Protein backbone atom coordinates (compact mmCIF):
# COMPACT_ATOMS: atom_id res chain seq x y z
CA UNK A 1 0.00 0.00 0.00
CA UNK A 2 1.32 3.47 -0.88
CA UNK A 3 1.80 5.92 1.94
CA UNK A 4 -0.09 8.04 2.35
CA UNK A 5 -2.73 5.77 0.89
CA UNK A 6 -5.58 6.94 -1.29
CA UNK A 7 -8.25 7.19 1.35
CA UNK A 8 -12.03 7.33 1.26
CA UNK A 9 -13.92 8.44 4.35
CA UNK A 10 -17.59 8.33 5.30
CA UNK A 11 -18.52 10.26 8.42
CA UNK A 12 -21.68 9.33 10.30
CA UNK A 13 -23.73 12.25 8.96
CA UNK A 14 -22.28 13.29 5.59
CA UNK A 15 -23.01 16.85 4.48
CA UNK A 16 -22.90 18.31 1.01
CA UNK A 17 -23.95 21.57 -0.66
CA UNK A 18 -27.75 21.75 -0.47
CA UNK A 19 -28.34 23.74 -3.66
CA UNK A 20 -26.21 21.38 -5.73
CA UNK A 21 -27.43 18.06 -7.08
CA UNK A 22 -25.89 14.80 -5.95
CA UNK A 23 -24.01 14.64 -9.25
CA UNK A 24 -22.78 18.24 -8.92
CA UNK A 25 -21.55 17.60 -5.38
CA UNK A 26 -19.54 14.59 -6.56
CA UNK A 27 -18.23 16.51 -9.57
CA UNK A 28 -17.04 19.28 -7.26
CA UNK A 29 -15.21 16.75 -5.06
CA UNK A 30 -13.78 15.05 -8.15
CA UNK A 31 -12.32 18.33 -9.37
CA UNK A 32 -9.98 18.38 -6.35
CA UNK A 33 -8.01 15.33 -7.50
CA UNK A 34 -8.61 15.81 -11.21
CA UNK A 35 -8.54 12.02 -11.64
CA UNK A 36 -12.28 11.33 -11.77
CA UNK A 37 -14.34 11.84 -14.92
CA UNK A 38 -18.09 12.05 -15.44
CA UNK A 39 -18.34 8.36 -16.39
CA UNK A 40 -16.76 7.40 -13.06
CA UNK A 41 -19.22 9.65 -11.20
CA UNK A 42 -22.17 8.13 -13.05
CA UNK A 43 -20.83 4.63 -12.30
CA UNK A 44 -20.51 5.28 -8.58
CA UNK A 45 -24.00 6.83 -8.45
CA UNK A 46 -25.31 3.64 -10.09
CA UNK A 47 -23.45 1.47 -7.57
CA UNK A 48 -25.08 3.23 -4.61
CA UNK A 49 -28.52 3.36 -6.23
CA UNK A 50 -28.75 7.10 -6.88
CA UNK A 51 -28.75 7.20 -10.69
CA UNK A 52 -32.39 8.24 -10.85
CA UNK A 53 -31.82 11.00 -8.27
CA UNK A 54 -28.45 12.27 -9.50
CA UNK A 55 -29.88 15.58 -10.76
CA UNK A 56 -32.06 16.17 -7.69
CA UNK A 57 -30.90 18.89 -5.27
CA UNK A 58 -29.12 17.49 -2.22
CA UNK A 59 -31.39 19.42 0.16
CA UNK A 60 -34.30 17.34 -1.18
CA UNK A 61 -32.55 14.04 -0.46
CA UNK A 62 -33.85 11.76 2.29
CA UNK A 63 -31.45 10.73 5.07
CA UNK A 64 -30.83 7.42 3.32
CA UNK A 65 -30.07 9.15 0.02
CA UNK A 66 -27.62 11.46 1.80
CA UNK A 67 -25.91 8.41 3.28
CA UNK A 68 -25.68 6.78 -0.16
CA UNK A 69 -24.14 9.94 -1.60
CA UNK A 70 -21.59 9.92 1.23
CA UNK A 71 -20.71 6.33 0.35
CA UNK A 72 -20.37 7.30 -3.31
CA UNK A 73 -17.99 10.13 -2.39
CA UNK A 74 -15.91 7.78 -0.25
CA UNK A 75 -15.44 5.14 -2.96
CA UNK A 76 -15.38 7.15 -6.19
CA UNK A 77 -11.58 7.47 -6.33
CA UNK A 78 -11.06 3.74 -5.70
CA UNK A 79 -9.27 4.17 -2.38
CA UNK A 80 -6.69 1.81 -0.87
CA UNK A 81 -8.03 2.61 2.60
CA UNK A 82 -11.74 3.09 3.31
CA UNK A 83 -12.88 4.39 6.71
CA UNK A 84 -16.63 4.08 7.27
CA UNK A 85 -18.43 5.47 10.30
CA UNK A 86 -21.84 3.76 10.58
CA UNK A 87 -22.15 3.10 6.81
CA UNK A 88 -25.66 1.59 7.08
CA UNK A 89 -27.05 4.47 9.16
CA UNK A 90 -30.47 5.68 7.85
CA UNK A 91 -30.55 3.10 5.04
CA UNK A 92 -33.53 0.97 4.10
CA UNK A 93 -33.16 -2.78 3.51
CA UNK A 94 -32.11 -2.31 -0.12
CA UNK A 95 -29.59 0.35 0.90
CA UNK A 96 -28.08 -1.92 3.57
CA UNK A 97 -27.74 -4.80 1.09
CA UNK A 98 -26.23 -2.51 -1.54
CA UNK A 99 -23.77 -1.07 0.97
CA UNK A 100 -22.73 -4.52 2.15
CA UNK A 101 -22.11 -5.53 -1.47
CA UNK A 102 -20.06 -2.37 -2.09
CA UNK A 103 -17.94 -3.09 0.99
CA UNK A 104 -17.37 -6.66 -0.25
CA UNK A 105 -16.42 -5.37 -3.71
CA UNK A 106 -13.99 -2.87 -2.22
CA UNK A 107 -12.38 -5.57 -0.06
CA UNK A 108 -12.12 -7.90 -3.08
CA UNK A 109 -10.38 -5.06 -4.93
CA UNK A 110 -7.76 -5.03 -2.15
CA UNK A 111 -9.04 -2.06 -0.17
CA UNK A 112 -8.43 -2.09 3.58
CA UNK A 113 -11.80 -1.29 5.18
CA UNK A 114 -12.10 0.01 8.74
CA UNK A 115 -15.64 0.62 9.95
CA UNK A 116 -17.74 1.35 12.98
CA UNK A 117 -21.17 -0.19 13.28
CA UNK A 118 -23.63 -0.93 16.07
CA UNK A 119 -25.13 -3.88 14.18
CA UNK A 120 -23.10 -6.94 15.22
CA UNK A 121 -24.58 -9.08 12.41
CA UNK A 122 -23.27 -6.67 9.77
CA UNK A 123 -19.83 -6.69 11.37
CA UNK A 124 -19.77 -10.49 11.55
CA UNK A 125 -20.84 -10.69 7.90
CA UNK A 126 -18.26 -8.23 6.56
CA UNK A 127 -15.26 -8.12 8.88
CA UNK A 128 -12.28 -10.38 9.48
CA UNK A 129 -11.61 -8.79 12.86
CA UNK A 130 -14.04 -7.14 15.28
CA UNK A 131 -13.07 -4.94 18.20
CA UNK A 132 -15.52 -3.86 20.91
CA UNK A 133 -14.49 -0.53 22.37
CA UNK A 134 -15.93 0.82 25.60
CA UNK A 135 -14.89 4.21 26.97
CA UNK A 136 -11.84 4.23 24.69
CA UNK A 137 -10.61 0.78 25.71
CA UNK A 138 -10.64 -2.35 23.55
CA UNK A 139 -12.67 -4.80 25.61
CA UNK A 140 -13.07 -7.74 23.23
CA UNK A 141 -11.33 -8.61 19.99
CA UNK A 142 -12.51 -11.47 17.81
CA UNK A 143 -11.27 -12.93 14.54
CA UNK A 144 -13.18 -14.79 11.85
CA UNK A 145 -12.02 -18.39 11.57
Regions found by a protein language model. Give the residues of each.
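Conserved ABC ATPase "signature" region
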Residues: 27, 38-53
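Conserved ABC ATPase signature
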Residues: 57-61
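Hydrophobic anchor residue at the start of the ABC signature
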Residues: 71
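Catalytic Walker B motif of ABC-type/P-loop ATPase nucleotide-binding domains
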Residues: 82-86
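Helix N-cap at the start of a conserved alpha-helix in ABC-type nucleotide-binding domains
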Residues: 93-94
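H-loop/switch region of ABC-family ATPase nucleotide-binding domains
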Residues: 117-118
Amino acid sequence: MDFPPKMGVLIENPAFLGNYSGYENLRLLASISGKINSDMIEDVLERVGLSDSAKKKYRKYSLGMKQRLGIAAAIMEKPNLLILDEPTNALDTDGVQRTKEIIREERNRGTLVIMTCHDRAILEDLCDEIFNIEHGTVMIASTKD
